[in-house]
């Protein structure tokens, strides 16, 4: 039951952005997630302090350096892995 509540909470906080070019609201950061097809997500900036999110950022740095192909922060992991990690950060 806790897992279901965790997923529902993640859906509220971790939202998929519909406008790929739109600016992120104050307090949020747009990231592109996926291996072949990238999807844009908005995540709270507070995630930047979390070790598990920092691990995703390190993976991104190793693969892309500071040259991100989408023009924004790209996290090269499967979408379900990203959702799993971020759902634990609430």
Swiss-Prot record:
**Protein name (record):** Auxin-responsive protein SAUR24
PANTHER family for the chain: SAUR-LIKE AUXIN-RESPONSIVE PROTEIN FAMILY-RELATED
Tell me which family the UniProt entry assigns to this protein. Belongs to the ARG7 family.
Its annotated compartments are: Cell membrane
Tell me the keywords, alphabetical order: Auxin signaling pathway, Cell membrane, Developmental protein, Growth regulation, Membrane
Q: Which organism is it from?
A: Arabidopsis thaliana
Q: How does it sit in the membrane?
A: Peripheral membrane protein
Q: Which Pfam families does this UniProt record tie to the protein?
A: Auxin_inducible
Q: Which gene encodes it?
A: SAUR24
User: What job does the chain carry out?
Assistant: Functions as a positive effector of cell expansion through modulation of auxin transport.
Signal sequence span is: none
For this protein, the record's InterPro entries field holds: SAUR_fam
Q: What cellular-component terms does GO give this entry?
A: plasma membrane
The UniProt induction remark is: By auxin.
- GO terms classed as biological process: auxin-activated signaling pathway
């Amino acid at each position: 039951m806790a897992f279901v509540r965790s997923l529902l909470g993640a859906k509220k906080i971790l939202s998929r952005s519909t406008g790929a070019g739109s600016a992120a609201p104050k307090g949020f950061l747009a990231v592109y997630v996926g291996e072949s097809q990238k999807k844009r997500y908005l995540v709270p900036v507070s995630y930047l302090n979390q070790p598990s999110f920092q691990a995703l950022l390190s993976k991104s740095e190793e693969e892309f350096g500071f040259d991100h192909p989408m023009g924004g922060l790209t996290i090269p992991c499967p979408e379900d892995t990203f959702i799993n990690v971020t759902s634990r950060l609430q």
